Amino acid sequence: MYTVIPTARFEKDIKYYIKKKRYFHIGEDIRQITNELQQGHLVGTEIPGLKISNHGHIFKVRSINTDTHSGQSNGYRILYYAISEELKIYLLTIYSKKDDNNIPSDGRPSCPHPRNPYKM
């Protein structure tokens, strides 16, 4: 079993969607994905060329947003970092596909910490 650890950025993103966007079912919507990750199923697509270290891989996975009634294609995107040797998965960020214009064009999620954007 993997340990799934939400980063401070991920928790901040969740709070934003609950408070500002009023997506009250976000926890239920992503629960299936976090359960899969705990079982060691690295769901989603690996993002090549985006590395934090040589020991892990970054993935992007789609999730439904039941608050918008628009399915997975316009649902959430979750970026996570998997370290197989340590059996740990760090949830990096979550964003709504409807808000993807807030994601920088170079493909990196915006982060407040300039040296290590995924400080854990």
Residue ranges of predicted features:
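Basic, Lys/Arg-enriched alpha-helical interface segments
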Residues: 1-72, 85-86, 96-120
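Short, well-structured beta-strand
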Residues: 80-92
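Short, surface-exposed coil-to-beta transition loops
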Residues: 73-78
